[in-house]
Swiss-Prot record:
This is Voltage-gated inwardly rectifying potassium channel KCNH2. Gene3D superfamilies: 1.10.1200.260, 1.10.287.70, Jelly Rolls (2.60.120.10), PAS domain (3.30.450.20). The chain crosses the membrane at residues 404-424, 451-471, 496-516, 521-541, 548-568, 639-659. The modification Omega-N-methylarginine is found at residue 1014. Changing residue 823 to W: In LQT2; uncertain significance. Keywords: Cell membrane, Coiled coil, Deafness, Disease variant, Glycoprotein, Ion channel, Ion transport, Long QT syndrome, Membrane, Methylation, Phosphoprotein, Potassium, Potassium channel, Potassium transport, Short QT syndrome, Transmembrane, Transmembrane helix, Transport, Voltage-gated channel. It is a multi-pass membrane protein. Changing residue 466 to Y: In LQT2; uncertain significance. Changing residue 644 to L: In LQT2; uncertain significance. The gene is KCNH2. Changing residue 102 to A: In LQT2; uncertain significance. Changing residue 791 to W: In LQT2; uncertain significance. It comes from Homo sapiens (Human). The modification Phosphoserine is found at residues 239, 243, 283-284, 320, 351, 871, 874, 1137. Residues 928-939 have a biased composition (Low complexity).
Length: 1159
């Protein structure tokens, strides 16, 4: 296999880095997007969920100011500081009191930290929460002077709020008040100054707090000013009188909506119950002066909403140095503004009190770097905060990538040096040491007499350099990440091959030089053979090619023979001087070649003769082909020969006897890899895939192959029985099924069935899993990595491990479309299950179904509620059987949650097309049909809604709120029916279409809408009559008609049993079968027996017509399915009007309902 490169594709490791830094510190934090409205929360960790008691699904997309944690003791000043911190680009800490979901209060230290992208702009905020103390331990609220008063939900009518702001810096400015006020007319407002404009009630003065403009809010008090005494006490003598607050222009409105010059929005001194909190800048120096004095500046005499006062405009646009110097001290004032403005006049600025938005104007460019203080606070180490972008793995300076070309060349060089060491180290230790002792000393001729010593010295130097390079070479950890940190590389190398490499690189001949013990040097030199371990650990890199495998096998055989030849010569050389009888193999060799040893032991064959003869003996012994010309004679030689024969037989049998088997075994996975890779490259070449896409394709294939090792799990599982397959799938998905809350409590059989349906998906960084507009056919569970969800270019959520995304399958009978793109930030592993498979399993285990849907919390709902899935082209996406099964399942699993979600249609009643904007004001419905006619297709009538059932519904009084004078829409009214009821037949409708009485409540045109987004009124749970265009009938008239219809239906129920009994009697006595209306067989004439049963029924039509006078009118207006043929306008009709006499009924066959294909 190729070199394991690890995860080298650019990844967005923002979430992983934050979690890794915080996981050991018990941090509680959320991440918010600074580029969306309200700085919505896009991620929260488990610690924050445990702290506040809310689940992750409840926190996502909420404002990061945590308004849902506010309570009676939450300080307004602290909340305003958090809001202002979100406007800037610097870190800030705020201490604030929050409330958990259970109502308990705690004091929390919030640390707001900005996060930048590659351009240096702040795109996100990290809010870290640290619990200081539980609020229950604090004293009574009377001592909490900075705590916020009760909100609207806890505040009794007429009770005002108290807001005291600690501004000690204002005390130092009192001495300069006159100078600043004198220059207020021509100066400019300080850039950092703000105005505090709040509703206050009189409170006890404090040495450190400043009561600002305390007034009482009254709903019917237009002026909004408190008593004159209070104003004089606050403003002081000499202050100019205030004019009506309605004359004060709103600079905030102009800054937010420059085009709305004609807006009538103005600042008000009082705060009504519908007003909202906002943040605004100071518009002039007068505002700053008034803030110091505790009042607002006097408004201009001629205020205009179309343009600002010239003086204000001049002050805003002034940038002179004198103005900045004049007000340099005002920047010390905390930048906090609470401006309660009555915005009811401008719908663009209107906001409900329950959802307080933070409107963040551009104060300054958010390009400040994260300070070192932030790094220390969050304990992020040297990495500071990661940037939110796709970035390649960070490589430290002077670090070598383990897959770089330089490293590859260096490894080949080291391999050659290792081979040299493996060959010459045993040779020099066995053959050359004796010659060195007999030759001249090295001190006289130096390295000129020993050329191999120079080479050995160079090899030792290269090995030492290789050790240094290994300290700077990256590696791949267990998480498939490339590690480039020098410290971690050193620790990894110390734990691995450092000891072996160090021992093999020690130059023992230099350390023991001059000691005279050449035998010891020769033995220590054999430690260099440990370098062969480097070759052994890299053999798998070259074992995928057949030629390389054969070459390595032959080299291994020759190297072992070389080592054995050196040992064979060492044995004979050791025994030769001490042997009296000349029987050793060296003596025999000398006698054979004519170079015998003399009596002193000198002479004999040359080194070349000795080595070649020894190598010849070992090869012949290893291959079991001994010719006997070189034979062992001494006991030592014979024992060694036995060992060589054993080794030879083992090598011969295992290598040469099974070369083909070894190659096939080594090539089994490699051959499949290259075959598949060849197919991929042929596909790329044939379709001319562009370069970037080609690289992504090859990179994914290589990583997927290394991830699965080329194993096709489906092919492997197919060879096992289903019970074993279920056990294997249960083991592979055990982490998800054991730790995911919705699967807890499921039986073993249910878990096995679910495990069989799950599929594992592996996604590289940058890969898009779901595109905007794609059908949501599966539910995804993240098991590793992190993903981001984008709407356009805006990140709306970041999901990590154990998060779930998709759509709530139990609320919709048909798959919806995605409202955003889902893109992987890192290498991700996801478990997905298709909606059909999940619904099928839950259908088999209905006792587990309710628990699953109630405990399933989808972290992010991808369903696009702004689109209408029930379009004509979407009918072909599902088969008839799956539609019926999904409709049945959706009915059985309906919950009351449908009525609580605006924009979703109730799943219990068949008529769920509410009077939304999409169905109102357009004649003819969504497909251009008239209100009183226009057929619709049977497919759309069956499964257009989230839940559709053919079973009759029990009728309940209609209580959905409707505008006055607006009748129920979707069905024509009675006078419309009278105008177009030429073909209406009450009798045939009563007999052959009793179900039409109930289908009146479920309009076919209403079922074309699966959901209505942003519906202002909740949808009824059981009965939802669609609303038509407004102004056609008053509400009282419609309700009276509904009551009359209810009474008629009650009468019908009393006669239904008798009528059905009569019909059954007619069918039983009919002797001949009546063919279908669309059949080619002619209907035989009625026999004489067919007229007698009809005589007793003569009074029945009259009674039925009387009892169904109004019902028939509604039935006549009901639309036919689009697949049914239209009724003929001329000629005989199948539905007889029967204007009072029943004689014709005896000669006419029974007719079918209008929905029958032949009617």
């Amino acid at each position: 296999m190729p070199v394991r490169r690890g995860h080298v594709a650019p990844q967005n490791t923002f979430l992983d880095t934050i979690i890794r830094k915080f996981e050991g510190q018990s941090r509680k934090f959320i991440i918010a997007n600074a580029r969306v409205e309200n700085c919505a929360v896009i991620y929260c960790n488990d610690g924050f969920c445990e702290l506040c008691g809310y689940s992750r699904a409840e926190v996502m997309q909420r404002p990061c100011t945590c308004d849902f944690l506010h309570g009676p003791r939450t300080q307004r000043r602290a909340a305003a500081q958090i809001a202002q911190a979100l406007l800037g680009a610097e870190e800030r800490k705020v201490e604030i009191a929050f409330y958990r979901k259970d109502g308990s209060c705690f004091l929390c230290l919030v640390d707001v930290v900005p996060v930048k992208n590659e351009d240096g702009a702040v795109i996100m905020f990290i809010l870290n929460f640290e619990v200081v103390m539980e609020k229950d331990m604090v004293g009574s609220p009377a001592h909490d002077t900075n705590h916020r008063g009760p909100p609207t939900s806890w505040l009794a009518p007429g009770r005002a709020k108290t807001f005291r702001l600690k501004l000690p810096a204002l005390l130092a400015l009192t001495a300069r008040e006159s100078s600043v006020r004198s220059g207020g007319a021509g100066g400019a407002g300080a850039p950092g100054a703000v105005v505090v404009d709040v509703d206050l009630t009189p409170a006890a003065p404090s040495s450190e707090s400043l009561a600002l403009d305390e007034v009482t809010a009254m709903d019917n008090h237009v002026a909004g000013l408190g008593p004159a005494e209070e104003r004089r006490a606050l403003v002081g003598p000499g202050s100019p009188p205030r004019s009506a607050p309605g004359q004060l222009p709103s600079p905030r409105a102009h800054s937010l909506n420059p085009d709305a010059s004609g807006s009538s929005c103005s600042l008000a001194r009082t705060r009504s119950r519908e007003s909202c909190a906002s943040v605004r800048r100071a518009s002039s120096a007068d505002d700053i002066e008034a803030m110091r004095a505790g009042v607002l500046p006097p408004p201009p005499r001629h205020a205009s909403t179309g343009a600002m006062h010239p003086l204000r405009s001049g002050l805003l646009n002034s940038t002179s140095d004198s103005d900045l110097v004049r007000y340099r001290t005002i920047s010390k004032i905390p930048q906090i503004t609470l401006n309660f403005v009555d915005l009811k006049g401008d719908p663009f600025l209107a906001s409900p009190t329950s959802d307080r938005e933070i409107i963040a104007p551009k104060i300054k460019e958010r390009t400040h770097n994260v300070t070192e203080k932030v790094t220390q606070v969050l304990s992020l180490g040297a990495d500071v905060l990661p940037e939110y972008k796709l970035q390649a793995p960070r490589i430290h300076r002077w670090t070598i990538l383990h897959y770089s070309p330089f490293k590859a060349v260096w490894d080949w060089l080291i391999l050659l040096l290792v081979i040299y060491t493996a060959v010459f180290t045993p040779y020099s230790a066995a053959f050359l040491l004796k010659e060195t002792e007999e030759g001249p000393p090295a001190t006289e001729c130096g390295y000129a007499c020993q050329p191999l010593a120079v080479v050995d010295l160079i090899v030792d130097i290269m090995f030492i350099v290789d050790i240094l390079i290994n300290f700077r070479t990256t590696y791949v950890n267990a998480n498939e990440e490339v590690v480039s940190h020098p410290g971690r590389i050193a620790v990894h190398y110390f734990k691995g091959w450092f000891l072996i490499d160090m021992v093999a690189a020690i130059p023992f001949d230099l350390l023991i030089f001059g000691s005279g013990s050449e035998e010891l040097i020769g033995l220590l030199k054999t430690a260099r053979l440990l370098r062969l371990v480097r070759v052994a650990r890299k053999l798998d890199r070259y074992s995928e090619y057949g030629a390389a495998v054969l070459f390595l096998l032959m080299c291994t055989f020759a190297l072992i023979a070389h080592w054995l030849a050196c040992i064979w010569y060492a044995i004979g050389n050791m025994e030769q001087p001490h042997m009296d009888s000349r029987i050793g193999w060296l003596h025999n060799l000398g006698d054979q070649i004519g170079k015998p040893y003399n009596s002193s032991g000198l002479g004999g064959p040359s080194i070349k003769d000795k080595y070649v003869t020894a190598l010849y003996f070992t090869f012949s012994s290893l291959t079991s082909v001994g010719f006997g010309n070189v034979s062992p004679n001494t006991n030592s030689e014979k024992i060694f020969s036995i060992c060589v024969m054993l080794i030879g037989s083992l090598m011969y049998a295992s290598i040469f006897g099974n070369v083909s088997a070894i190659i096939q075994r080594l090539y089994s996975g490699t051959a499949r890899y290259h075959t598949q890779m060849l197919r991929v490259r042929e596909f790329i070449r044939f379709h001319q895939i562009p370069n970037p896409l080609r690289q992504r394709l090859e990179e994914y294939f290589q990583h997927a192959w290394s991830y699965t090792n080329g194993i096709d799990m489906n092919a492997v599982l197919k060879g096992f029985p289903e019970c074993l397959q279920a056990d294997i799938c249960l083991h592979l998905n055990r982490s998800l099924l054991q730790h995911c809350k919705p699967f807890r409590g499921a039986t073993k059989g249910c878990l096995r069935a679910l495990a069989m349906k799950f599929k594992t998906t592996h996604a590289p960084p940058g890969d898009t899993l779901v595109h905007a507009g794609d059908l949501l056919t599966a539910l995804y569970f993240i098991s590793r990595g992190s993903i981001e969800i984008l709407r356009g270019d805006v990140v709306v959520a970041i999901l990590g491990k154990n998060d779930i995304f998709g759509e709530p399958l139990n609320l919709y009978a048909r798959p919806g479309k995605s409202n955003g793109d889902v893109r992987a930030l890192t290498y991700c592993d996801l478990h997905k299950i298709h909606r059909d498979d999940l619904l099928e399993v839950l259908d088999m285990y209905p006792e587990f179904s309710d628990h699953f849907w109630s405990s399933l919390e989808i972290t992010f709902n991808l369903r696009d509620t702004n689109m209408i899935p029930g379009s004509p082209g979407s009918t072909e996406l599902e088969g008839g059987f799956s539609r019926q099964r999904k409709r049945k399942l959706s009915f059985r699993r309906r919950t009351d949650k449908d009525t609580e979600q605006p924009g979703e249609v109730s799943a219990l009643g068949p008529g769920r097309a509410g009077a939304g904007p999409s169905s109102r004001g357009r004649p003819g419905g969504p497909w251009g049909e008239s209100p009183s006619s226009g057929p619709s297709s049977p497919e759309s009538s069956e499964d257009e809604g989230p839940g559709r059932s053919s079973s009759p519904l029990r009728l309940v009084p209609f209580s959905s709120p409707r505008p006055p004078g607006e009748p129920p829409g979707g069905e024509p009214l009675m006078e419309d029916c009278e105008k177009s009821s030429d073909t209406c037949n009450p009798l045939s409708g009563a007999f052959s279409g009793v179900s039409n009485i109930f289908s009146f409540w479920g309009d076919s045109r209403g079922r074309q809408y699966q959901e209505l987004p942003r519906c202002p009124a909740p949808t009824p749970s059981l009965l939802n009559i669609p609303l038509s265009s407004p102004g056609r009938r008053p509400r009282g008239d419609v309700e009276s008609r509904l009551d009359a219809l209810q009474r008629q239906l009650n009468r019908l129920e009393t006669r239904l049993s008798a009528d059905m009994a009569t019909v059954l009697q007619l069918l039983q006595r009919q002797m001949t079968l009546v063919p279908p209306a669309y059949s080619a067989v002619t209907t035989p004439g009625p026999g004489p027996t067919s007229t007698s049963p009809l005589l007793p029924v003569s009074p029945l039509p009259t009674l039925t017509l009387d009892s169904l006078s109004q019902v028939s009118q509604f039935m006549a207006c009901e639309e036919l399915p689009p697949g049914a043929p239209e009724l003929p306008q001329e000629g005989p009709t199948r539905r007889l009007s029967l204007p009072g006499q029943l004689g014709a009924l005896t000669s006419q066959p029974l007719h079918r309902h209008g929905s029958d294909p032949g009617s």
